[in-house]
From Swiss-Prot:
Organism lineage: Eukaryota, Fungi, Dikarya, Ascomycota, Pezizomycotina
Compositional bias segments (type: Polar residues): 132-153, 222-240
Organism for this UniProt entry: Fusarium equiseti
Gene that this sequence comes from: fscB
Region ranges (Disordered): 114-153, 207-242
Composition-biased stretches (Low complexity): 120-131
Protein name: Transcription factor fscB
Function: Transcription factor; part of the fragmented gene cluster that mediates the biosynthesis of fusarochromene, a tryptophan-derived metabolite closely related to a group of mycotoxins including fusarochromanone.
Disulphide linkage map: none
Composition bias type Basic and acidic residues, residue spans: 207-221
Amino acid sequence: MECHYSEAQLASLLLPYLERFDENAINGLASELKSHGISVYAAAGFDPNVGSSLTFKKEVPPSDTSILEDVDHVNLYSEQDNFHLSMLDMMDFHTPDIMDIGLFTDVQHEGDPVDELELSSDTRSSLSPSSHNTTTGHETGLSSVTPPQSYWTSDNLVSTRALPTTGDKQLSPQRRTEIADISSLPTCQQISLEPQCHSVMEAPCHGKEVTKRNKRSRTEAQEASNSPCASSTADSQTNPAPLRLRSVFGPGTKYNLSHKSLHEISDISENCIRPDLVEFLEERLTRWKKTGFWHQDQIPEPTASGAGREKLIDAYSCICRLESRMKDDQILNRVAVVMLHTAYEQACQEWRHAGTHQRKGRGRGDATTVIDEILSELHEDWDVGDRKRYHRSRFHDKKRFGKRWLVLIKSLGVGILLCSSQRLASAVYVLPFQITLFILDTNLSESAATRRFLPATCCRRWFAVSNSLRLNSC
């Protein structure tokens, strides 16, 4: 029995199976078609305006040299033969949704998909180019190559378009019943169907191995992330916090911060600013007004001027009293460890300049010797057991924490000691200290008005990111 059909009819018959079934089902379909005297050549092509496409051609004798036509440029025959209709009924033909396909689940919004088909030397052949497209193809029986962006059904052309995403969930593609001009679509709405991984398949008719993999350059990935579609989807998500900030800091105000900046400020405040900041300040300011910041009746205020040695002793003594009497006062502890670090730096410079102490051994310089003398004066159990090692380690830990808080103060202002959340404060006391501050410049970030409200409202855009930079020396 001889069958007459067009390339468009073959495309409408085969493309849905390329999208719906896995490799074994595709090979079985090819074998079934071959039993009816049908063999198909499949060629993959790429056009910057259209994307990936498939071209089908009936297997003909060597004397027939007809040129392949791209499936997107073929006129559909209105009259279809009985064989084609019977094949549709036999195989339960339907048009599946792209998101329901199990074979191609890696769907990305890319305008210029780069799907490279690498062939073995036995399967490589030259094909005639189609209109507006240079086709570099190969001859196989049927293999699950990248499907095109549109395919023919028994009635008309169905185009699969990607809809904008909402969050991490992508909506189902829209099925259109008119001929779609893919080149006129925005770049972010052209869909690219890429295989999930590198795979090697065997062509069912010729037994050839086809190596299929996709490559994507770094430049294209950056262009996709910087596309207007990506920014529009992010801005489309409604966040109530920027809505509250917009009237004060948004566009049109004296600060004139963009919507993106307002979103960042909202996210940062949720993670790095304590949620009870207003209530905390109201309660503490009342107490500090009555008793003083350092509670002078219990803890003497550390010396802010004078020699480094005296300042170091005062700061360390203050820390010891805070831990023994007021362990819950975290604000005072943060200030004290910062003063301990600054006093230690000043004392080290003075000791190096004086050079009064001689090095006693490897790794033990002036600073180590002086610290041991100070700790022995402050702790009565200095010479008991391993208490000497304990006090040394404790002193250097406090000094290290002070240096870390000082890093935050230099970037964010001294107000961070008051408004820091427990999550950010806990990162300071983690060993090793893994934190990086990304401070994104804005037009008003260095203005006096911005610096004035920076500690309380975080209107200078910043964020603490762990596992980015290890400050082991802190």
